[in-house]
Amino acid sequence: QAHPQLLLGSMGPIGIEWFAEDSAEYREIRGIAREQAHALLNAGVDGLLIETVTSIRNLQPMLAGARDAADGMPVLVSFVVDDKGDLLGDGLNIEAAVLYAEKHGANSVGVNCCSLAAANAAVPRMVASATTPVTVRPNVGDPVQTQDGPVWHENPEAFARACIEWRHAGAAMVGSCCGTSAITTAAMAEALDRCLACAVYAHP
């Protein structure tokens, strides 16, 4: 049986300073996020994904604008964390970030574009503090800079094993971010299918 395929509309980071909610700058950014969300939803996506969020100041107007346009569609939020599992940009602990996102309407919280070590640190903390599904999508490794740009050294088997560990830790959705090729994606899919088959067999 084929897996259901869902398409999320990605809304990336904006790299702003903090603005008060009643400022013209905040309202402008919120309006831009609203327009982007409208465009993605009109194109037929199944939900909105605000990803690679490094700080709450970046999330605030983006999440508000996305919620303005969502009209019942899910809005997922995904943070970038350091190897301790806290936000890379402002150092806020991941539990507080989860609380803020959920309080302001996020239907799922997670991490992406981080190291495996960062994901390993963040996932159990997020699962323990979140009331919504937790997602995890780290990079496949550390890039090596060459004259032709960054080169990523994949270890599909190790990444697939990590996916199983995140699922066992309580993550609802697992995947990958930068450096991913079809090889790693296939290894993930195979490992997760085996994990699901074993779970179904053990708990009919």
Q: Language-model features: where?
A:
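Domain-level signal for soluble alpha/beta catalytic cores
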Residues: 1-204
